[in-house]
Amino acid sequence: MLTVWLTPHSNLLNEVVVFAENPRMIVEKAINKIPLNYSDKRDMLTGFYRETVQKGRRYIGISEAVLDVSKTAYTNRNINYDKVRVEKGRRLLSQKASDTLAVKVVGGPNLGVTLDVVKNKGALLDFEELNNYEFWMAESMLIDNRMQYVINFRPKVILMYALLYGKLYIDRERLSFTRIEMSLDMQNATTAILYKKPLGLRFKPQELSYLVTYKDVDGKTYLNYIRNTIRFKCDWKRKLFSTSYTVASEMVVTDRKEGVLENIPNKEAFSLNQIFYDKVDEY
């Protein structure tokens, strides 16, 4: 008589992920919920700002500041009345006269206004602008223990101005934007990046990328962190080799006061055409 012993054994099959949701529809629903999910009051944010300039791997400029950022409610998504004030500033590393090219950031501290993609609908999240892009689902992921839709996007048309590609992270339950990663299409990037340059200098853009994150606090979602990175190469006519530069600007929100009626006076606001590196000694 033959006796056979059988031992139970569980064998987990590979997971099959099926995306039944329409990514464009999810983005549109999240846009419609912005007035509900984000602040409906005027807030005053405190932020730490830093901008750095690298020539190759060497830092040639580092400047820092403490900022006040006055933001109106997200209900109308209008940034015209949002302002930035530099409270304190310092230059940790100055560019030298021996550097053949001075690289400076125009309007840098205004990151908290212009690159708040959820508030500034002109940046990406506008229903008409969405028509310029195609969207597709990526694998979901957790951020702060909350499940997120991850939606890729890229241009589907060619326009006179540069478009973007990247990822949108949207909270599955609340349909709030929690993280936005974007890069500029390099085909028409020079106009978007370059403010002015010396005669005879050839400018070759390599990268313009953005990272914006938001944080949920007591049922509302608030701006948390912004980073802007620009990489480019420059060479002079009749020169054999080019030089690479990396310019990074970032702001992290360190404090927030809700329902603040005070606005930043125009004379104290940092304007979009000012250069923080040149003005840092005034603070």
Residue ranges, per PLM feature:
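Interdomain boundary/hinge segments at the C-termini of tandem beta-sandwich modules
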Residues: 6-8
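Outer-membrane beta-barrel pore domains and translocons
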Residues: 50-52, 154-156, 169, 183-185, ...
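Mid-length scaffold segments of soluble, non-membrane domains
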Residues: 161-171, 177
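Short, acidic, Ser/Thr-enriched surface-loop or helix-capping motifs
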Residues: 171-172, 216
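Structured extracytoplasmic
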Residues: 10-11, 15-163, 189-190, 237, ...
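Acidic, serine/threonine-rich low-complexity disordered tracts
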Residues: 125-131, 137-147, 178-251
